[in-house]
Structures are given as structure tokens and as C-alpha cells.
């Protein structure tokens, strides 16, 4: 009787799906209210003027304007600001 021995099983072969984090709109770019600027885990970037923060720490524009990245305070925090266009 011709038989084949059972093949071994691998304990590898799985990986988590990428979360697509990072900066979505860069300094100098024009954004509309509601546009996502940064997707992040924790507050790598902090919200400044005209920028809101979601429960997953996503930063988004509250007003139409130009994105600006600044470093503020004694802690040298990276802050995202929206400079509204002159009306």
C-alpha cells in the first residue's frame, strides 16, 4: 500500500493589516474643514488653532485654510495649526 506521510504544519504565516497611519496633509497644503491632517496612535502631533482631535487622536481641520506644522512650548511639542485664508 502506497502511503504518504502527513505534512508538517507551520506556526508562522499571519500578519496584522497595516493601519495607514501618518501625515495625510503636509505644511503649506490647503485643506477644507473636516479634512484629516494626521492619523496617529497617541499624540505625536498636538492640535493647535483651528485643528480638532478625534477619540483615536486623529487631527482634522475645523476651518478651511493652510496647514502649518510648528514646534511650541518648553516640551517642544509638534503642533498642527490651520491658518485660515483672508476673507
UniProtKB/Swiss-Prot annotation:
PROSITE patterns: RIBOSOMAL_L27. Residues 1-21 are annotated as: Disordered. This is Large ribosomal subunit protein bL27. Belongs to the bacterial ribosomal protein bL27 family. GO terms for cellular component: cytosolic large ribosomal subunit. Gene3D superfamilies: 2.40.50.100. PANTHER family: LARGE RIBOSOMAL SUBUNIT PROTEIN BL27M (PTHR15893:SF0), RIBOSOMAL PROTEIN L27 (PTHR15893). GO terms for molecular function: structural constituent of ribosome. NCBIfam families: L27 (TIGR00062). It comes from the Bacteria. Signal peptide: none annotated. InterPro entries: Ribosomal_bL27 (IPR001684), Ribosomal_bL27_CS (IPR018261). Keywords: Ribonucleoprotein, Ribosomal protein. HAMAP family: Ribosomal_bL27 (MF_00539).
Amino acid at each position: 500500500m502506497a502511503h504518504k506521510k502527513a505534512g508538517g504544519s507551520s506556526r508562522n504565516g499571519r500578519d496584522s493589516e497595516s493601519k495607514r497611519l501618518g501625515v495625510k496633509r503636509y505644511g503649506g497644503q490647503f485643506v477644507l474643514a473636516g479634512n484629516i491632517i494626521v492619523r496617529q496612535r497617541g499624540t505625536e502631533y498636538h492640535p493647535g488653532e483651528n485643528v480638532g482631535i478625534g477619540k483615536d487622536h486623529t487631527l482634522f481641520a475645523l476651518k478651511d485654510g493652510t496647514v502649518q506644522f510648528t514646534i511650541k512650548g518648553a516640551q517642544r511639542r509638534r503642533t498642527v495649526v490651520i491658518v485660515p485664508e483672508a476673507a
